[in-house]
A protein has these predicted regions:
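Active-site beta->alpha loop and helix N-cap motifs at the rims of alpha/beta catalytic domains
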Residues: 1-103
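Catalytic alpha/beta core domains of metabolic enzymes, predominantly
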Residues: 84-87, 97-171
């Protein structure tokens, strides 16, 4: 809820909260609900993460901060701040470098795998080989069942599955 298809970047945090509340009133306990909580600043992202946990989502997800190319440690701090605001909720890294301007690197993924709430990557990068690299890193850190990689673009679903994606989160 509230990801790329939901035009999250263009909505005010209050609008995003209202949408999530409406979705949860209908879907909670019936389907898996993942709330995208990224904003252009950490404070709003943290606020949305805490709200999502309060609403009872199954997981939160986030792209990296957009526009400026930040070092890995700054992106990790941004994501970990959101995760800390929702300590009982799983966290999914959303890799979409063609729109976010920053790609998930292996050093950044390995740093994020130190956070036990990080359970998956949604990969929307064009090289489907990234799926295999992310999956291998997750298996190495968490074991075969402890980490998932989801394919993003619908048109790459089959090739993503061939590369090891556990499923897809399309738009």
């Amino acid at each position: 809820v509230g990801g790329s298809s939901g035009e999250c970047i263009y909505q005010h945090p209050d609008e995003r909260k209202a949408v999530l509340e409406a979705v949860m009133s209908e879907a909670k306990g019936k389907i898996t609900v993942i709330a995208h909580v990224a904003c252009n600043n950490t404070a709003d992202s943290v606020e949305l993460a805490a709200h999502a946990e309060k609403c009872g989502v199954d997981a939160i997800a986030s792209i990296p901060p957009i526009y400026f190319h930040l070092p890995n440690y700054a992106i990790a701090d941004y994501w970990n701040a959101m995760s800390a605001a929702a300590p009982n909720t799983e966290f999914i890294i959303y890799n979409i470098p063609q729109l976010a301007g920053t790609a998930l690197t292996m050093p950044l993924l390995n740093e994020m795998l130190k956070n036990p709430n990080v359970i998956a990557v949604k990969n929307s990068s064009m090289p489907t080989q990234d799926i295999q690299m992310f999956k291998d890193a997750g298996i190495q850190a968490r074991g075969a069942d402890g980490f998932a990689v989801f394919n993003g673009p619908d048109e790459q679903f089959v090739s993503g599955r061939v590369m090891g994606a556990d499923g897809g989160i399309g738009g």
